[in-house]
Amino acid sequence: MGNHDMKVYGRSFEGSVAAFEAVYGPSYYSFNVGEVHYVVLNDNFFIGRDYFYIGYLEERQLRWLEGDLSYVPPGSTVVVCFHIPSTCSERDRKQFEYGKAGLTMTNHRGLHAILKPYRAHILSGHTHTTYNQPVTDSLYEHVIPALSGAWWQGELCTDGTPRGYGVFTVDGGEVAWYYRSTGRPADYQMTLYDGLDYPQFEGYVVADIWASDPAWRVELFADGHSAGIMERFEAYD
Protein backbone atom coordinates (compact mmCIF):
# COMPACT_ATOMS: atom_id res chain seq x y z
CA MET A 1 0.00 0.00 0.00
CA GLY A 2 1.46 3.35 -1.05
CA ASN A 3 0.78 6.91 0.02
CA HIS A 4 -1.43 7.40 -3.06
CA ASP A 5 -3.58 4.39 -2.09
CA MET A 6 -4.87 5.79 1.19
CA LYS A 7 -7.46 8.39 2.12
CA VAL A 8 -5.46 11.49 3.01
CA TYR A 9 -8.21 13.43 4.72
CA GLY A 10 -10.35 12.61 7.74
CA ARG A 11 -9.72 12.39 11.45
CA SER A 12 -7.47 9.37 11.95
CA PHE A 13 -5.07 6.80 10.52
CA GLU A 14 -7.70 4.07 10.89
CA GLY A 15 -10.01 5.88 8.49
CA SER A 16 -7.24 6.37 5.94
CA VAL A 17 -6.90 2.64 5.21
CA ALA A 18 -10.59 1.66 5.31
CA ALA A 19 -11.33 2.18 1.61
CA PHE A 20 -8.22 0.26 0.51
CA GLU A 21 -8.98 -2.67 2.82
CA ALA A 22 -12.64 -2.78 1.72
CA VAL A 23 -11.51 -3.45 -1.86
CA TYR A 24 -8.19 -5.30 -1.56
CA GLY A 25 -8.21 -6.85 1.90
CA PRO A 26 -5.76 -6.36 4.79
CA SER A 27 -3.04 -3.73 4.45
CA TYR A 28 -0.57 -5.99 6.28
CA TYR A 29 -0.21 -9.77 6.04
CA SER A 30 2.32 -12.56 5.47
CA PHE A 31 2.78 -15.74 3.45
CA ASN A 32 5.36 -18.42 2.67
CA VAL A 33 6.77 -19.35 -0.74
CA GLY A 34 9.33 -22.13 -0.68
CA GLU A 35 11.87 -21.52 2.07
CA VAL A 36 11.23 -17.77 2.31
CA HIS A 37 8.74 -16.00 4.58
CA TYR A 38 7.25 -12.82 3.07
CA VAL A 39 5.70 -9.98 5.08
CA VAL A 40 3.78 -6.96 3.77
CA LEU A 41 3.38 -3.98 6.12
CA ASN A 42 1.81 -0.52 5.86
CA ASP A 43 4.01 2.33 7.11
CA ASN A 44 2.03 5.17 5.51
CA PHE A 45 0.70 6.78 8.69
CA PHE A 46 -1.89 9.53 8.21
CA ILE A 47 -1.89 11.84 11.24
CA GLY A 48 -5.32 13.46 10.88
CA ARG A 49 -4.26 16.58 9.00
CA ASP A 50 -5.30 16.69 5.34
CA TYR A 51 -2.62 15.28 3.00
CA PHE A 52 -0.11 14.91 5.84
CA TYR A 53 1.42 11.55 6.63
CA ILE A 54 4.65 10.21 8.10
CA GLY A 55 6.60 6.99 7.74
CA TYR A 56 5.61 5.09 10.87
CA LEU A 57 4.68 1.55 11.94
CA GLU A 58 1.94 1.53 14.56
CA GLU A 59 2.37 -0.65 17.65
CA ARG A 60 -0.43 -2.94 16.47
CA GLN A 61 1.56 -3.93 13.39
CA LEU A 62 4.82 -4.33 15.33
CA ARG A 63 3.15 -6.66 17.85
CA TRP A 64 1.50 -8.60 15.03
CA LEU A 65 4.89 -8.94 13.31
CA GLU A 66 6.49 -10.28 16.50
CA GLY A 67 3.74 -12.89 16.74
CA ASP A 68 3.99 -13.76 13.05
CA LEU A 69 7.75 -14.26 13.18
CA SER A 70 7.50 -16.41 16.31
CA TYR A 71 6.57 -19.22 13.90
CA VAL A 72 9.63 -18.61 11.70
CA PRO A 73 12.90 -20.28 12.79
CA PRO A 74 15.75 -17.84 13.51
CA GLY A 75 18.23 -17.69 10.64
CA SER A 76 15.49 -18.07 8.03
CA THR A 77 15.25 -15.70 5.07
CA VAL A 78 12.52 -13.10 5.53
CA VAL A 79 11.47 -10.53 2.90
CA VAL A 80 9.59 -7.51 4.26
CA CYS A 81 7.78 -5.11 1.92
CA PHE A 82 6.42 -1.65 2.66
CA HIS A 83 6.27 1.70 0.87
CA ILE A 84 8.25 4.36 2.78
CA PRO A 85 11.91 3.32 3.30
CA SER A 86 13.27 2.55 6.74
CA THR A 87 16.68 4.01 5.79
CA CYS A 88 17.90 7.05 3.87
CA SER A 89 20.69 7.46 1.36
CA GLU A 90 23.43 9.90 2.37
CA ARG A 91 21.85 12.50 0.11
CA ASP A 92 18.38 12.07 1.61
CA ARG A 93 19.76 11.96 5.17
CA LYS A 94 21.24 15.44 4.75
CA GLN A 95 17.80 16.71 3.79
CA PHE A 96 15.95 14.94 6.61
CA GLU A 97 14.16 17.13 9.13
CA TYR A 98 10.93 17.01 11.11
CA GLY A 99 8.98 18.68 8.32
CA LYS A 100 9.98 15.86 5.97
CA ALA A 101 9.05 12.95 8.25
CA GLY A 102 7.22 11.35 5.33
CA LEU A 103 10.55 10.50 3.65
CA THR A 104 11.55 7.65 5.94
CA MET A 105 10.17 5.41 8.70
CA THR A 106 10.54 7.39 11.92
CA ASN A 107 10.50 4.33 14.24
CA HIS A 108 12.63 2.04 12.10
CA ARG A 109 14.80 0.91 15.03
CA GLY A 110 11.92 -1.11 16.46
CA LEU A 111 11.40 -2.90 13.16
CA HIS A 112 15.10 -3.58 12.68
CA ALA A 113 15.31 -5.07 16.19
CA ILE A 114 12.45 -7.49 15.43
CA LEU A 115 14.21 -8.62 12.24
CA LYS A 116 17.60 -9.11 13.90
CA PRO A 117 17.37 -12.93 14.28
CA TYR A 118 16.70 -13.39 10.55
CA ARG A 119 18.39 -13.02 7.19
CA ALA A 120 16.15 -10.17 6.15
CA HIS A 121 15.64 -8.14 2.99
CA ILE A 122 13.48 -5.02 3.02
CA LEU A 123 11.84 -3.89 -0.24
CA SER A 124 10.61 -0.28 -0.26
CA GLY A 125 10.13 2.64 -2.65
CA HIS A 126 8.41 6.04 -2.34
CA THR A 127 11.39 8.33 -3.04
CA HIS A 128 11.54 7.84 -6.84
CA THR A 129 15.26 7.15 -6.35
CA THR A 130 17.26 3.95 -6.12
CA TYR A 131 19.76 2.81 -3.52
CA ASN A 132 20.70 -0.39 -1.73
CA GLN A 133 21.60 -0.10 1.93
CA PRO A 134 23.26 -2.82 4.04
CA VAL A 135 21.88 -2.08 7.51
CA THR A 136 23.61 -4.93 9.38
CA ASP A 137 25.31 -8.15 8.35
CA SER A 138 21.89 -9.82 8.23
CA LEU A 139 19.62 -6.94 7.14
CA TYR A 140 19.63 -5.29 3.71
CA GLU A 141 17.22 -2.69 2.33
CA HIS A 142 16.47 -2.29 -1.37
CA VAL A 143 14.88 1.07 -2.23
CA ILE A 144 13.41 0.61 -5.69
CA PRO A 145 12.62 3.60 -7.93
CA ALA A 146 9.36 4.27 -9.69
CA LEU A 147 7.99 2.63 -12.80
CA SER A 148 6.51 6.07 -13.53
CA GLY A 149 9.95 7.76 -13.54
CA ALA A 150 9.38 11.38 -12.57
CA TRP A 151 5.65 10.89 -11.98
CA TRP A 152 5.03 10.12 -15.70
CA GLN A 153 6.59 13.48 -16.64
CA GLY A 154 9.84 11.97 -17.92
CA GLU A 155 11.79 8.77 -18.46
CA LEU A 156 14.18 9.36 -15.53
CA CYS A 157 13.60 9.24 -11.80
CA THR A 158 14.75 12.21 -9.73
CA ASP A 159 18.26 10.78 -9.24
CA GLY A 160 18.84 9.96 -12.92
CA THR A 161 17.80 6.30 -12.73
CA PRO A 162 15.73 5.26 -15.76
CA ARG A 163 12.22 4.25 -14.81
CA GLY A 164 11.96 0.54 -14.17
CA TYR A 165 11.64 -2.15 -11.54
CA GLY A 166 13.61 -4.57 -9.38
CA VAL A 167 14.03 -8.21 -10.39
CA PHE A 168 14.54 -10.69 -7.55
CA THR A 169 15.30 -14.39 -7.85
CA VAL A 170 15.26 -16.87 -4.99
CA ASP A 171 17.15 -20.16 -4.78
CA GLY A 172 16.28 -21.88 -1.51
CA GLY A 173 16.94 -19.15 1.03
CA GLU A 174 19.38 -17.18 -1.16
CA VAL A 175 18.16 -13.93 -2.73
CA ALA A 176 19.73 -12.30 -5.81
CA TRP A 177 18.63 -9.11 -7.51
CA TYR A 178 19.23 -6.58 -10.25
CA TYR A 179 17.54 -3.45 -11.59
CA ARG A 180 15.71 -3.60 -14.92
CA SER A 181 15.11 -0.38 -16.86
CA THR A 182 11.87 -0.38 -18.81
CA GLY A 183 12.47 -1.25 -22.46
CA ARG A 184 16.18 -1.97 -21.89
CA PRO A 185 18.16 -5.24 -21.76
CA ALA A 186 19.07 -6.69 -18.38
CA ASP A 187 22.74 -5.69 -18.71
CA TYR A 188 21.90 -1.97 -18.99
CA GLN A 189 23.03 -0.98 -15.48
CA MET A 190 24.73 2.42 -15.61
CA THR A 191 25.17 5.77 -17.32
CA LEU A 192 28.79 6.70 -18.13
CA TYR A 193 30.06 10.27 -18.56
CA ASP A 194 33.52 11.52 -19.51
CA GLY A 195 35.22 14.87 -19.99
CA LEU A 196 35.21 14.61 -23.78
CA ASP A 197 31.44 14.86 -24.09
CA TYR A 198 30.73 16.60 -20.77
CA PRO A 199 33.16 19.48 -20.03
CA GLN A 200 32.08 19.64 -16.37
CA PHE A 201 33.72 16.22 -15.94
CA GLU A 202 37.03 17.21 -17.55
CA GLY A 203 39.73 14.82 -16.40
CA TYR A 204 37.23 12.38 -14.92
CA VAL A 205 35.03 9.44 -15.88
CA VAL A 206 31.77 9.35 -13.91
CA ALA A 207 29.59 6.24 -13.68
CA ASP A 208 26.05 6.43 -12.32
CA ILE A 209 25.47 2.78 -11.34
CA TRP A 210 21.85 2.45 -10.33
CA ALA A 211 21.75 -0.70 -8.18
CA SER A 212 25.08 -0.36 -6.37
CA ASP A 213 25.56 -0.25 -2.62
CA PRO A 214 28.26 1.34 -0.39
CA ALA A 215 30.24 -1.91 -0.23
CA TRP A 216 30.69 -2.17 -4.00
CA ARG A 217 34.20 -1.92 -5.45
CA VAL A 218 34.00 -0.40 -8.94
CA GLU A 219 37.01 -0.73 -11.24
CA LEU A 220 37.44 1.24 -14.47
CA PHE A 221 38.88 -0.49 -17.53
CA ALA A 222 40.14 1.30 -20.67
CA ASP A 223 41.25 -0.59 -23.78
CA GLY A 224 41.13 -3.83 -21.84
CA HIS A 225 43.40 -2.64 -19.03
CA SER A 226 42.58 -1.53 -15.50
CA ALA A 227 42.66 2.25 -15.04
CA GLY A 228 42.09 2.06 -11.30
CA ILE A 229 39.40 1.85 -8.64
CA MET A 230 36.69 4.49 -8.95
CA GLU A 231 35.91 6.77 -6.01
CA ARG A 232 32.33 6.77 -4.72
CA PHE A 233 30.50 10.07 -4.22
CA GLU A 234 26.92 11.34 -3.89
CA ALA A 235 25.53 13.71 -6.53
CA TYR A 236 22.53 14.31 -8.75
CA ASP A 237 22.58 12.86 -12.26
Name each model-derived stretch.
Residues 91, 188, 229-231:
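Outer-membrane beta-barrel proteins
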Residues 139-225:
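Binuclear metal-dependent phosphoesterase catalytic core
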Residues 1-74, 93-123, 129-171, 175-178:
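Extended active-site neighborhood of metal-dependent phosphoesterases/phosphodiesterases
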Residues 2, 43, 83, 212, ...:
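Cofactor-binding loop segments of dinucleotide-utilizing enzymes, especially the Rossmann-like FAD-
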Residues 226-237:
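Solvent-exposed serine/threonine-rich low-complexity stretches and specific carbohydrate-binding patches
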